[in-house]
């Protein structure tokens, strides 16, 4: 792994106007990171990654890199782009456990964060480093939101979320699981209890219906509901998945792991929105594809 990422870093052209950085939604300074890696300045590279994006250890695994940083790499026009996701993952994974928590001067203000998904975790870490006393309110028993309950283990190890939780606790962030805001506790109660600000990061958990006949039948499930608790669903041996996005690939691969013998993905047209490597994995694991 280490030799691989060094080889990849050495391929970086250090473009004056790096398109890879422009292709990243949060503008990760990719040429700078690759150069620091080549200079054996691993911790410095990790510090820059986490300052830019505290969720670097997650994004380097689950982001759609081929449409973002790697998809914009100029080397990809004639050959293969730099595999920056592997570089970032190696650095951020190494840095996460070794990151030293700085001495933070508290400003005396309390902030409530509702929801512990990627947005909630990012905001909590940023605010804690800025001196705020942060409390996260999470309605489920574990933090992570969609990272915990929507992305399968084979795509994102849940141990990464546990490591984030440990680091957050070291930062003094308080986590209150199994706490629903909006029933017994409302936002007004939080302000009454001394919180100066409230961040709402509850995510988008409600699936979107497609409006076709039979959609409400008992053996028809939304992908997000299935991925949350696949062991609670009895799909049978023959499963149809409507859609060609990354969620559809996750559903198909999960179904095969939970006893389905035949899984077929259906699309209305010829377009596949899932990343090419997720499609490849899904095909390798035995799923079939049917296009309209």
Language-model features and meaning:
Residues 1-110, 158, 200-217, 287, ...:
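Ferredoxin-type iron-sulfur electron-transfer modules and their immediate structural context
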Residues 92-98, 178-181, 219-227:
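Short gly/ser/thr-rich secondary-structure transition/capping motifs
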Residues 133-136, 140-171, 175, 252-292:
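Rossmann-like dinucleotide-binding cores of NAD(P)H-dependent redox enzymes
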Residues 198-201, 222, 241-242:
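Redox-cofactor binding/interface segments in oxidoreductases and associated redox assembly factors
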